[in-house]
């Protein structure tokens, strides 16, 4: 199946339990899938959320604030799914494949949101740079933690450095973004991403 930006958005489960806030985030996710973030209006969000503009402004001051919250929660959910998919006692090659497989699973479920995170968030300006950086830092820490698992330790593979983790994060994000933009099957990146990640981790182990 070809994966493109028209695929259905996955449900959003923000930390806040407020039902209207959750519905508004889901409404934005649906509108991004339907027409993209830039063309989405608050009217679109409340239409999908089946609520009112008044309710929207009780939760968020702007479309941008809602977008940032959506991406924050989506990022945390993705990390949670990746961590849950990795068996820390498995051979480290297998752990890398499990992590990348889970990453691709999430992209398949909500390609438009992931693409917005990579492409559209930076265009909002310097005020959201800290949000994007925090998301990247969370991914870096996840990779460092995974590479500290027993499966890596058994083969004397040291934990990934922050620099190595950043290279992996940046490369995977860009590869995934280009694949989605080209309306290709994102599963096609798995073998290449796994091979590149294994090679980079192995090279790092040799130089440490």
Question: PLM features: what roles do these ranges have?
Answer:
Residues 76-79, 126-152, 162-170, 174, ...:
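Amphipathic alpha-helical packing segments from all-alpha helical-bundle domains
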Residues 118, 150-196, 204-208:
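Hydrophobic/aromatic-rich alpha-helical bundle segments in the mid-to-C-terminal region
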Residues 105, 112-141, 156-158:
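Short secondary-structure transition hinges
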Residues 27-31, 106, 142:
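Short amphipathic alpha-helical elements of helix-turn-helix/winged-helix folds
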Residues 23, 27-34, 77-88, 171-182:
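Solvent-exposed, amphipathic alpha-helical segments
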Residues 23, 28-65, 69:
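Helix-turn-helix
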Residues 69, 83-109, 164, 190:
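Hydrophobic alpha-helical connector segments
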Residues 1-19, 154-156, 205-208:
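N-terminal intrinsically disordered/low-complexity leader segments
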């Amino acid at each position: 199946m070809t994966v493109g930006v028209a695929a259905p958005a996955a449900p959003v489960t923000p930390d806040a339990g407020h039902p209207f806030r959750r519905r508004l985030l889901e409404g934005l996710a649906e509108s991004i899938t339907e027409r993209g973030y830039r063309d989405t209006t608050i009217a679109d969000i409340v239409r999908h959320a089946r609520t009112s503009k008044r309710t929207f402004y009780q939760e968020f001051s702007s479309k941008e604030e809602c977008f940032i919250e959506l991406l924050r929660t989506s990022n945390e959910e993705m990390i949670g799914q990746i961590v849950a998919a990795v068996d820390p006692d498995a051979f480290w090659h297998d752990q890398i494949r499990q992590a990348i497989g889970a990453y691709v699973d999430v992209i398949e479920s909500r390609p438009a949101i992931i693409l917005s995170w990579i492409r559209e968030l930076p265009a909002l300006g310097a005020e959201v740079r800290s949000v994007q950086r925090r998301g990247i830092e969370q991914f870096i820490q996840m990779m460092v933690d995974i590479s500290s698992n027993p499966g890596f330790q058994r083969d004397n593979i040291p934990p990934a450095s922050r620099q190595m983790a950043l290279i992996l994060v940046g490369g995977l994000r860009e590869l995934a973004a280009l694949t989605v933009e080209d309306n290709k099957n994102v599963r096609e990146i798995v073998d290449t991403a796994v091979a590149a990640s294994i090679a980079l981790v192995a090279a790092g182990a040799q130089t440490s």
